[in-house]
Amino acid sequence: ETDRINFTTAEQIHTGWDHAANAYYAGELGKWNIDFNADYLFKRSHSDQNAMNNDDATVQADSRMRSSLYAAKLVVSAPLWNGRFSFGTEETFTNRHDIFTQNGFSADADDHIKQSVYAAFADYSRSIRHWKLNMGIRYEHQQTDYYEKGIRIDAQSPTYNDIIPVLAASWSHNGKSFSLSYRLRKNNPDYS
């Protein structure tokens, strides 16, 4: 006698609306140029998975995800000492929450990650005869908070405070040019 196994898999994905909003302003106030932009994104998803073995539910899984992003940047600039001075701020906030539950084939997961980045910067550029000079500085504060089942995991929740300089000089005359620059680049670990 042979046992017969009928195995059926079904997945149901619940989709909803993704939301995106953008605001932008570019204008002048006296000698000051103002450039502002902001973005907001929101997304969520829900997926049910069921695997049947001879009409018995053998594997059930439920996956839910919710994420949002807000980002904004403001740059203000004006002439200063025969050059151009600009300063501004930049902010980014992300929030993602993933919940995965099932009936015993692997561990449940409830992961939540939030990240905030605040930055302030200033830049000055000036042309002197055949030279163009530029210098700037940026301060950046980055805070990441990672939670498993509502408990903050300190080892995966770093905070960074960085000062990032930029220096550049270029020369151009009679079709010849030369450039020298220094920039400190920051590479953050990936998170997903």
Task: Locate each region found by the language model.
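Short, surface-exposed, polar/charged, turn-prone segments marking secondary-structure boundaries
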Residues: 63-64, 162-164
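Outer-membrane beta-barrel signature, preferentially recognizing the C-terminal barrel domain
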Residues: 10-16, 109-115, 155-159, 163, ...
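Feature captures outer-membrane beta-barrel proteins of Gram-negative bacteria and organelles
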Residues: 74, 122, 163-169, 180
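Eukaryotic, compositionally biased intrinsically disordered regions
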Residues: 147-155
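Face-selective signature of the C-terminal outer-membrane beta-barrel domain
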Residues: 9-148, 172
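Active/binding-pocket-proximal capping segment
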Residues: 137-142, 152, 183-187
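Periplasmic-side early beta-strands and strand-to-turn transitions of outer-membrane beta-barrels
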Residues: 1-6
